[in-house]
């Protein structure tokens, strides 16, 4: 689930929220390949882009290759580590790299990974998180023409409880206008 490579240079680059530790090998994600929005919870009570990045840097592929860092494209805070409802884009989004969030090659390559801080098996996301997520999902779905049926929870692509039983996925999907 690692990613390597860079987006072709087509303008000014923004400074990543967290820069990867390893250089890419030239793999590129063509424009227009985003087809899914994959929603996750961190499974923790607190967290930030930086803390998840450090944790994910410790992970390795089956062949021993280290991950570049944070697996997601966006993180939404809950007030413990990041402001409640704060949305941060990670280096994967800023450089248009595929994710390492889904445990499935297709959904890593074609899915935008969005992680909300919290464990939604135990507590529901905050209203601020849900408002921020609805806004983000609506904007991304419109920009990349992603239909609401392709706004999914992580559990749709891998056997997991993520994003948790208390996560209101249907409400998020309904925020995306019908095509």
Spans of model-derived segments:
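Flexible, surface-exposed loop/gating regions in the mature catalytic domains
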Residues: 96-103
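Conserved beta-strand segments of the P-loop GTPase G domain that flank and frequently precede/overlap
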Residues: 40, 115-116
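Basic/polar, cationic surfaces and motifs that engage anionic cell-wall
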Residues: 1-34, 78-81, 86-89, 93, ...
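Short, charge-rich binding segments
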Residues: 65, 104-105
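Short, conserved "active-site rim" segments that organize catalytic pockets and cofactor/ligand binding
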Residues: 25-95
């Amino acid at each position: 689930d690692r990613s390597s490579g860079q987006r072709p240079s087509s303008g000014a680059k923004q400074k990543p929220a967290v820069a990867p530790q390893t250089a890419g090998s030239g793999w590129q994600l063509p424009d227009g390949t985003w087809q899914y929005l994959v929603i996750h919870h961190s499974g923790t009570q607190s967290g930030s882009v930086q803390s998840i990045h450090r944790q994910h840097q410790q992970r390795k592929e089956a062949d021993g290759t280290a991950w570049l860092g944070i697996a997601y494209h966006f993180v939404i805070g809950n007030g413990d580590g990041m402001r409640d409802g704060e949305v941060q884009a990670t280096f994967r989004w800023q450089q248009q790299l595929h994710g390492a969030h889904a445990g499935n090659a297709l959904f890593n390559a074609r899915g935008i990974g969005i992680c909300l801080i919290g464990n939604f098996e135990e507590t529901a996301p905050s209203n601020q998180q849900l408002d921020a997520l609805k806004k983000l999902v609506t904007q991304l779905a419109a920009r990349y023409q992603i239909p609401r049926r392709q706004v999914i929870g992580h559990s749709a692509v891998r056997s997991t409880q993520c994003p948790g039983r208390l996560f209101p996925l249907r409400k998020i999907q309904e925020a995306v206008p019908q095509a």
